[in-house]
Curated annotation (Swiss-Prot):
Family under the similarity heading: Belongs to the universal ribosomal protein uL6 family.
UniProt organism field: Rickettsia prowazekii (strain Madrid E)
Entry keyword set: Ribonucleoprotein, Ribosomal protein, RNA-binding, rRNA-binding
A single GO molecular function term of this UniProt record: structural constituent of ribosome
Membrane-traversing stretches: none
GO cellular component: ribonucleoprotein complex; ribosome
Protein name per UniProt: Large ribosomal subunit protein uL6
InterPro entries named among the record's database cross-references: Ribosomal_uL6-like, Ribosomal_uL6-like_a/b-dom_sf, Ribosomal_uL6_a/b-dom, Ribosomal_uL6_bac-type, Ribosomal_uL6_CS
Pfam hit, one: Ribosomal_L6
Protein function: This protein binds to the 23S rRNA, and is important in its secondary structure. It is located near the subunit interface in the base of the L7/L12 stalk, and near the tRNA binding site of the peptidyltransferase center.
PROSITE patterns, per the entry: RIBOSOMAL_L6_1
Length: 177
């Protein structure tokens, strides 16, 4: 029995949920999200709650049970409140700029890195070394953040690179003579 999957999802005020077989459409004050689920699960609306139930007893149905419930819960939170991620850029001369629909990163390479900003993600740069990402889709926001971090992941000796704000980087000692 899935500990996550068996919990019902309460639908808050201001959020509308539409069900069509395994397609879930959720709209709220921040926007609209839709997702089609695959697998042996059933999504049922009871009063002001959504319930996800497995249709079979096999391993795939049990795996999708908790996953589908978590994804739907994240969709509801996204359209109601939204998600925010904060990235830090550490290093001399490392900085970020937004030009049009591109994020321009200067990361001590022979060229500047340009990354196209997805349409449903907003970027704010309070400082040159801090990137604030905001969006309603938690999955796409995390994927975009990982694309940015992949350009220059933090290294353990000097701590240079791009990382999540609250992530601790285990530092290593350099060579000794």
């Amino acid at each position: 029995m899935s500990r996550v999957g068996k919990l019902p999802i309460t639908i808050p005020e201001g959020v509308k949920v539409g069900l069509n077989d395994l397609e879930v459409k959720i709209s709220g004050p921040k926007g609209e999200l839709s997702k089609t689920f695959k697998g042996n699960i059933a999504i049922i609306m009871e009063e002001n709650k959504l319930v996800v139930k497995p249709l079979a007893v096999n391993k795939n149905a049990r795996a999708m049970w908790g996953t589908a419930r978590s994804i739907i819960c994240n969709m509801i939170t996204g359209v109601k409140e939204g998600f925010k991620l904060k990235l830090e850029i550490n290093g001399v001369g490392y900085r970020a700029m937004v030009k049009g629909k591109y994020l321009n990163l200067m990361l001590a390479k022979s060229h500047n890195t340009k990354i196209e900003i997805p349409s449903n993600i907003k970027i704010d740069l309070p400082k040159q070394n801090i990137i604030l990402l905001e969006g309603i889709d938690k999955e796409k926001l995390g994927q975009f953040a990982s694309i940015i971090i992949k350009q220059r992941p933090p290294e353990p000796y000097k701590g240079k690179g791009i990382k999540f704000e609250n992530k601790f980087i285990q530092r290593k000692e350099g060579k000794k003579n």
